[in-house]
Structures are given as structure tokens and as C-alpha cells.
Amino acid sequence: MAEAFKFELVSPERLLVSEQVESVVIPGAEGEMTVMAHHAPVMTTIKPGVVTVKTASGGEERYVVFGGFADIVPAGCTLLAESAVAVKDVDRADLARRIQEAKEDAADAKDDQARSKAEQFLSQLTTLEGAILPA
């Protein structure tokens, strides 16, 4: 059994998780990363995706995040999400609204850089939609 460490998942609305866990898989901007106890210190941005938490009791919890930052130190990990919700509580209409807004942002972009950023975000959202919502 892996050693436990402190993990917190915080959104502007509330503290979703604050407990001892064995591991956390984070959708980092540069790719998924697994955090375990005594991880090297790092701060990274997170992209829209699913955070998978393996609890110290052996259970698994999944949360959808819509961007933010992860602060990882040897003693723990704090994920500050722009928005977060348990996968089981995902609102299909809210996700559809976010996708529509991203499409509009891409269409209304003033330059190539803004368009590219909006299209990347749209791609992340549609990938997320396919990963968590049944057809």
C-alpha cells in the first residue's frame, strides 16, 4: 500500500476534497501526471479534464475540473480549480453551454493566437465531454 499524503481540491465555490490520499492523477497542461507522497515540488497549470483520486481507504473518486493550478510539494498537493464538480454530478447542459461559448470565442477571435487558444480549449472540452458523458 502506498504512503498517504494530504490532497485538497478547491474551487471558488467550495472545498471539494481535503483528505489523506494515496495518489492523484491531474490533467496537467503538458499531459497527465500522477502525484504520490514525497513528489518533487512543482507548480503546474491544469487543463479541463478529470482528476482521479485514490483515497487512503482504497476507494476512487473522480472530479471534473475546468482549468486551474496544482501546487505539489513533498507533503501534499493542492489543486486550485477554476471550476470543479464530482463526475457523478456533472451537468450535461452546463458542459454544452461551455462548449458553445468556446465555439463562439473561436469564431470571434481577433487574431490567430487568440483563435488557436480558443480552439485548443474547445478541443479539450469536447474530449472531456466524450470521456465523462455516455452517448
From Swiss-Prot:
Pfam families: ATP-synt_DE_N
Ion transport found in the keyword field: yes
GO cellular component: plasma membrane; proton-transporting ATP synthase complex
Membrane topology designation: Peripheral membrane protein
Keywords: ATP synthesis, Cell inner membrane, Cell membrane, CF(1), Hydrogen ion transport, Ion transport, Membrane, Transport
Highest taxon of the lineage: Bacteria
Transmembrane segments: none
GO molecular function, one term: ATP binding
Compartments it resides in: Cell inner membrane
Record has Zinc as a keyword: no
Subunit structure comment from the entry: F-type ATPases have 2 components, CF(1) - the catalytic core - and CF(0) - the membrane proton channel. CF(1) has five subunits: alpha(3), beta(3), gamma(1), delta(1), epsilon(1). CF(0) has three main subunits: a, b and c.
Function: Produces ATP from ADP in the presence of a proton gradient across the membrane.
Stored PANTHER family: ATP SYNTHASE DELTA/EPSILON CHAIN, ATP SYNTHASE EPSILON CHAIN, CHLOROPLASTIC
Protein family: Belongs to the ATPase epsilon chain family.
Name this polypeptide is given: ATP synthase epsilon chain
Source species of the chain: Mesorhizobium japonicum (strain LMG 29417 / CECT 9101 / MAFF 303099)
Taxon lineage: Bacteria, Pseudomonadati, Pseudomonadota, Alphaproteobacteria, Hyphomicrobiales
Gene symbol of the encoding locus: atpC
